[in-house]
């Protein structure tokens, strides 16, 4: 529930450093917030790689370098100090992982209120193996982001879906059934093994008309070819 009888934050730190798809959904929630509260200053803590996702939004950035400057416990404390220097007065943790927990804990000790995303892991776990019968749709991540803001006292409607604009398909005319396969991750533990990925692509190719392997550059792009 939103906080009652509390002044709304004037400068909000929003934390989401990965994964790319989750960061890409954040601007939809921010746009809904800014439409209702244009006077609220927002600083997004993320990787510089993801800045283009927020084009057209009136937000600032606090870049986080998870592999260098802000690595480990000391890095998290350093990042919290940098955030505090911006005079933020609330934190919206849209990630809720070990690093963001350390950052928000350090800021909370400074008296800065925090709000954290509820990822719905129990609901997702309960759905496994049940099929589709009698199962209600899970709450969309964008709505979960909005709820984080609402728990800080903001009150605004859910974002409106963007209007679809016709664009030419760079992959050509769609014929048959296409499927995408994304075996890679920024974290090694979440990356599907190469041999199993190759076997998965082989099996998918026998069942679908086109298989798209989503990858980054370097070795990932080489595998995708």
Residue ranges and their predicted role:
Residues 1-225:
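Catalytic machinery of carbohydrate-active enzymes
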């Amino acid at each position: 529930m939103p906080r009652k009888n509390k002044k709304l934050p004037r400068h909000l730190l929003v934390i989401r450093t990965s994964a790319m798809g989750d960061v890409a959904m954040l601007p939809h929630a921010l746009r809904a917030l800014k439409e209702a509260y244009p006077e609220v200053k927002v600083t997004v803590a993320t990787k510089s790689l993801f800045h283009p996702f927020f084009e057209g939004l009136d937000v600032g950035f606090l870049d986080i370098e998870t592999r260098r400057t802000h690595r480990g416990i000391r890095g998290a404390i350093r990042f919290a100090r940098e955030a505090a220097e911006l005079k933020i007065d609330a934190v919206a943790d849209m990630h809720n992982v070990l690093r963001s927990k350390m950052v928000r804990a350090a800021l909370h000790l400074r008296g800065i209120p925090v709000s954290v995303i509820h990822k719905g892991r129990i609901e997702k776990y309960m759905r496994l193996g049940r099929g589709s019968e009698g199962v209600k749709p899970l709450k969309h991540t964008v709505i979960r982001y909005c709820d984080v803001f609402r728990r800080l006292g903001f009150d605004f409607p859910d974002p409106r879906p963007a209007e679809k604009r016709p664009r030419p398909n760079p992959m050509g005319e769609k014929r048959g059934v296409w499927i995408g396969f994304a075996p890679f991750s920024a974290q090694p533990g979440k990356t599907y093994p190469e041999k199993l990925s190759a076997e998965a692509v082989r099996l998918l190719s026998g069942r679908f008309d086109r298989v798209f392997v989503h990858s980054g550059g370097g070795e990932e792009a080489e595998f995708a070819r």
